[in-house]
Structure formats: structure tokens, C-alpha cells
């Protein structure tokens, strides 16, 4: 399953809920959720740990728009919009965490 998170971990508990209950699969961080993947962020350690169970992706245009593309934690892969579409097509189900 592809889990899509779009809210900052400082704004909503969506990412924590996803990490806590999601079955292994892929997690895509988009919009303000990309802040979680920045080195030194409050959620970086939790996200790095989640990388053991999930493949974690960040939408690169969103990271670039927030000036954190060069500060992403180890193990996080970046995708462009075409990669976003590919992830959706590769996974049978998608869950958006609001």
C-alpha cells in the first residue's frame, strides 16, 4: 500500500498515526509533510526508524519549494511528479493521511 501524507508533523498527527499503524509498504511525503524528512526535524528520527519497515519517498518539487531538498535524511528517496504517478500505479491501494 502507498501511504500519502501531506500535513506537517508540527501541524497534525497524521504522520505519527501513519507510522504507528500502517502495514509495511511505501510512504510518500508531499506538501508540508516533506518537513518531516529534513535533518534535525522533530520527526526525522521517527521517520528514519520507519525506513526499516517502509520505503520512504519525498516529492522533490515540494522539498525544493521549501528549501530543504539538500537537507533530507539518509534513506529517503526523492521522486518528481512522474515518479508520484508511478508510485500510485505500482501500488494496488493508496491511503491519504489527512
Positions of PLM-derived features:
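Histidine-anchored nucleotide/phosphate-binding helix
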Residues: 10-24
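N-terminal beta-loop-helix "entrance" segment that forms/cooperates
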Residues: 33-49, 68
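Structural motif corresponding to alpha-helix initiation and N-cap regions
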Residues: 12, 40-44, 78-81
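C-terminal structural segments of small proteins and small subunits
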Residues: 66-98
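Short, glycine-rich nucleotide/cofactor-binding loops
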Residues: 1-14, 32-40
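Short, conserved loop/helix-junction motifs that constitute active-site signature segments
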Residues: 19-23, 45-53
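Short internal beta-strands
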Residues: 25-31, 54-62
Amino acid at each position: 500500500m502507498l501511504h500519502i501524507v501531506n500535513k506537517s508533523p508540527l501541524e497534525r498527527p497524521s504522520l505519527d498515526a501513519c507510522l504507528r499503524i500502517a502495514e509495511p509498504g511505501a510512504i510518500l511525503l508531499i506538501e508540508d509533510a516533506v518537513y518531516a524528512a529534513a535533518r534535525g526535524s522533530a520527526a526525522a528520527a521517527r521517520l528514519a526508524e520507519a525506513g526499516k519497515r517502509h520505503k520512504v519517498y519525498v516529492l522533490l518539487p515540494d522539498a525544493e519549494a521549501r528549501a530543504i531538498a539538500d537537507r533530507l535524511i539518509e534513506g529517503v528517496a526523492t521522486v518528481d511528479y512522474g515518479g508520484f504517478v508511478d508510485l500510485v500505479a505500482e501500488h494496488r491501494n493508496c491511503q491519504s493521511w489527512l
